[in-house]
């Protein structure tokens, strides 16, 4: 122990060393006996007083002694303290000191307050070892003002010491009172019979050595509560804050066969082998198949829920309610697993279908490049080519086949395209310089002139395939699309620009070069059906709608009468499909396959595709009214697949009373002409 004047400095020394300035301690002790008694009494009073801080610990909780100087705890007090040792708080190293008979004439000053090496007491029998210890029960010793304190693992003893015991000290720190800091070769003295007789009125008591074995000087923490016993909901409601134990940052987690996680803190286990020995199972990583199975068939959103009791502020569940909730939870998990299994099977099926399509495309590309394209004029009308065409064109040769199928009846050359493009650029330049004047002119111009304006082209380009982000301003194909549409307005001022042309031009740009795309675009819009729609020829458009209704009634009579009951005419949904050639209504890859067969069969396939869409969603449309039907057909579902759609298209028969599409349309043209003649004759 360190005295009050040491200011925290160490006051213990190695065995056999002398304190500096005390080489003649024997002479000084004889001359200063009275001074030593006075200093000892003051130190005893210092220790026995409560609420006084020592340099090696706080003794605030020592039993309060007498008011007089030198008053010490009595034997009865010490017995009471030892009996109620659990109630005595020793927060940071304070020692419980019992009374002892101080040797007369002790003039050791502060030496008696230091940790000293024990020497044989007068009552120790000869031949006994002055210090004895056991390796299994490490002990330490310290003296406080003539009181020898023996710290053992099982009990705490107080022995008398002589003045000679203060001369031999061993090294130690005021905080290093733990057994593992005992100097090498030191042990505690054996108990002397004389001491036992003198202290016979004081029975042996269990002292504070038990506190040292409990890690007395370390910070005490509360025992962690089991998380499973704490009520609360993990996901819903307000949960009161729960006290959780501080976990080590390094946690060994083991995944057992039941899927639960067991964690072991690393300081508690020496190595993994010890953990395996305690748990009785080896630590093996889960196999790849097991891990994959868990990822595919265990829904994390439901199996991660932990069933707990209700919060403490709510009534507890009854047994019946607990069983019912458990059953409902198991049912939800089972349903979620079924959905996961179905989703995994669906993804697997789609992957197989995609692989099959890629293999078919690869084999078809070889046939097209080696057999069909070199002999196009001869092979294009054969049954083999038509069947291969129906399955879809490989993307690598799609643009070339489209160019050959559409043809170039207008005899447009790349040089002609450059001429019209330069004219369009001049118009853009003049439009930017006189923007206000052009706006005034557009306000008083005709409908065709307004649609041919560059402002309308700009607006429509920004709405072309917005999900691709390649045709908008700043995209890689923005200027290219703008050039083709501007050149076409200069090439066909009678048609100008109509909303929907940007989608057709964009699909061609994705599959052809710039000049070839413009040639195909101009020739495609020159077809009778597209020309009638883009020139907004109402009489021709009505004839196409009438021909469509003939085959509509032939193939889908129930849906046809359902549409007529709500007065739903074909123009409400066919105009958008024909203007954009299904590139806006269908997914892009599916629209390209529609374009493949459209290049083979012509305008007939456009109306056949419309009937295929109606057949695909016939059951849904029969349950809808006018508004919902129009909304549904304007924006078709995005999950439509090419196999289902083309299966429904193949089921549509484009024959009516042994008449094909062209024959029906021609007869309708004659009827309309005869009707026009009769109306004119009646007027005259």
Curated annotation (Swiss-Prot):
Regions of compositional bias (Basic and acidic residues) in chain numbering: 172-183, 240-250
Coiled-coil blocks: 331-365
Domain Rab-GAP TBC: from-to ranges: 392-602
Domain of life per record: Eukaryota
Compositionally biased residues, Acidic residues: 25-34
Renumbered residue ranges of the record's region Disordered: 1-41, 119-138, 169-202, 219-290
Matches recorded under InterPro entries: Rab-GAP-TBC_dom (IPR000195), Rab-GAP_TBC_sf (IPR035969), Rab_GAP_TBC_domain (IPR050302)
SMART domains in the record: TBC
UniProt KW Coiled coil keyword: yes
Any GO molecular function: GTPase activator activity
PANTHER family linked to this entry: RAB GTPASE-ACTIVATING PROTEIN 1-LIKE (PTHR47219), TBC1 DOMAIN FAMILY MEMBER 12 (PTHR47219:SF24)
Protein name: TBC1 domain family member 12
Native source species: Xenopus tropicalis
